[in-house]
Amino acid sequence: SRLRRAVPPQKPASVLTNGTPSALQLSRRRGLHAFAIAALSSTLGMGSPAMAQEAKVRFQLDWRFEGPSALFLLPAAKGYFKAAQLDVTIDAGNGSGGTVTRVASGTYDLGFADMAALMEFHANNPDAPNKPVAVMMVYNNTPAAVMALKKSGIKSPKDLSGKKLGAPVFDAGRKAFPVFQKANAISNVQWTAMDPPLRETMLARGDVDAITGFSFTSLLNLEARGVKLDDVVSFPYAEHGVKFYGNAIIASEKFLKENPAAVKRFLEAFSKGAREVIANPAAAIEHVKARDGIINVALETRRLKLAIDSVINSTDARSEGFGQAQAPRLALMASQVSDAFNTKTRVNASAIWSGQFLPDAKTLDILPKR
């Protein structure tokens, strides 16, 4: 048999002839060191969202499951919150005031509510613990508007002088009407109160001359009661001297302190979903129908599109940036709310808003160009 050729003994590759560690050995040591750091980071809950501990988030909307609620229901249904290590439950609401109160009480961690309602709560409950804070602006402009039938002869806001207006006492537009009234030199208005389902009905049958309400709600409700939209005149507050912010995502003070990373992840996942809703409202409505099977899909699709066009992708929103709020505008609104709502104390604008939890600019760049 053939004999193998003798080979001189080799020194281990990990040791050089002078006894110092080789490049391979150093590489292995660095790898072990990096692995140890990664393991420690995982133990401490640092790193990517996938490594973070799952957080439970109780969220309440401002109103029923309607078109605009797709902004929250889509990212939930598509698993965007879950992928961000968030266990999110979403409940319907019955008004922004109630949502603010329930977030303050701790019943909910986060919510969707009107900024004026948030300011009112702060100013009327200065000593209350756990006051909610707005962390992302969604409706850059208030949807509040005054609506009347053209046959009433009302052609401009000033024509409302001496007229009878109707709205529920807690309606955002009614409460902010003194600001609209001052901006448009309106005098001698009489108010009639009613439950929300009767508001548009009373206008349609002539019991009141005009109503206040969210434009994308009242206009479609009037149409459902047989009124043609061509027969309606509408005065959006945002276009008539009232630069109020609309609805924002709010968080309890306690939740912000205990779960700041969870709030950031929520806003990132929400922004991802909102981008899809704005791009394809018709598809997004299917997620609303999944939560409330009796909705009118065509009607709610129109409601969502109206909300997107009028208050989400508005001129002000594109100027300021989605999700953002500007300090001077907040300060003016705080002063106007203090006066119009006759609050116990003046609204402190700096206490009701925090932009530190917002995603980066790229994530927030979700508004399509017009």
Model-inferred region functions:
Residues 258-342:
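Secondary-structure end/capping motifs
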Residues 1-26:
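N-terminal secretory signal peptides that target proteins for export/translocation
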Residues 38-45:
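Hydrophobic core
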Residues 330-370:
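Conserved C-terminal helix/tail region of periplasmic/extracytoplasmic solute-binding proteins
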Residues 116, 125, 198-201, 208-297:
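Pocket-lining segment of extracytoplasmic ligand-binding domains
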Residues 52-205, 209-216, 235, 242-243:
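Short, glycine-/small- and polar/acidic-enriched structural segments
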Residues 46-52:
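Sec/Tat signal peptide C-region and signal peptidase I cleavage site
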Residues 20-38:
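N-terminal secretory signal peptides and thylakoid transit peptides that target proteins
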